[in-house]
Amino acid sequence: MNEKIETITREIQKLKEKTFKVFFFVYNTKGVPSGSLTYIYQTASYLKELGYNVQMLHTEEDFQTPETWLNNVDVASLPHLNIQKEKIEVSASDFLFIPEIFADVMAKTKEMPCKRVAILQNYDFMTELIPVGASWNTLKIHDCVT
């Protein structure tokens, strides 16, 4: 019981001190501008400016950051991690933001201890890309931002 209390106390302290992690799952546009990715990077950059520990997650070997076309965001200041190559440690106080187009990521991360939040930018994708018989609820996504 004491171990659980210590863990809870540690996670609460991370929230108070802004040392928890805020992950954003992003996709590779290969240099092509994207409005939805602009929103994600602007949000991530703003949170970093406020002192939060922001990290961008992706899965591609040849991932290109959007700094060639995204001029109003300091993309270089945001760490980019390839989740297929690097070990990502996630705790209960962390947040993972997942664009609605990544139902597969929602499914693969549903047992993670962090708070997972969908980023809904296109209403059509909310149900179109989710597996048959699944819902955000069955994928343990209970919150979204638009």
Task: For each feature predicted by the language model, list its residue ranges.
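Extended catalytic core of nucleotide-activated donor transferases of GT-like folds
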Residues: 9, 63-142
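N-terminal pre-catalytic "stem/leader" segment of glycosyltransferase-like enzymes
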Residues: 1-95
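Active-site capping/gating segments
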Residues: 146
